[in-house]
Amino acid sequence: SFRGHGGPLGADLSAYFPAPDDDGSTPIALAQVIPGGHVAASQAIREQIDGARRRLDVMNPYVTDADMLGRILAAARRGVSVRLVVSQTSNNAQATAALKHYYPDLTEAGVELWELPDTVVHAKVVVADDVVSFGTVNLDAWALYRNNEIAMLARSAETAELIEERLFEPDIARSKRGVPPAGARERFESWLWNTLGSFL
């Protein structure tokens, strides 16, 4: 911010905040995570996942929080069509290993695991039926409970379909199916990093 950088706030901010060409018509709810216990964005995403009845599509670079993974598993077990899109090769090997600890349970529950190659997934998007959330919230302990984060939520079938059409479907088409860890070393590493998941 201007204040954080020690400078005065400019008199004319129009160059930074130009008027949109279209004001839009989709209402957006804004929720935050503020360190110290205000976790409205985290709670909104929890409720979104818990409320899914038909579909749940999740794209996120870091999915290590046991509570969120439990909710994703619960959605699949109650018959929701669930797809999880992550990086095939992440910039955080520990977070990838921690998530892979859940691959057997996720696969058994019917979750489609998709790993996007040749890039690091950076989107933080959840589509649950016709509710969409997007923003800065990774599904890990730092983002959900400790960092300053923000999420925007839209209850809109049209928005949900646009996100599916422009983000999920093309990326899933380029992705490879995720497979559970194989071999004693990989299984041990995934167990270890999952055990330390609250620090990731």
Label for each model-derived stretch:
Residues S1-L200:
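Charged, low-complexity intrinsically disordered terminal segments
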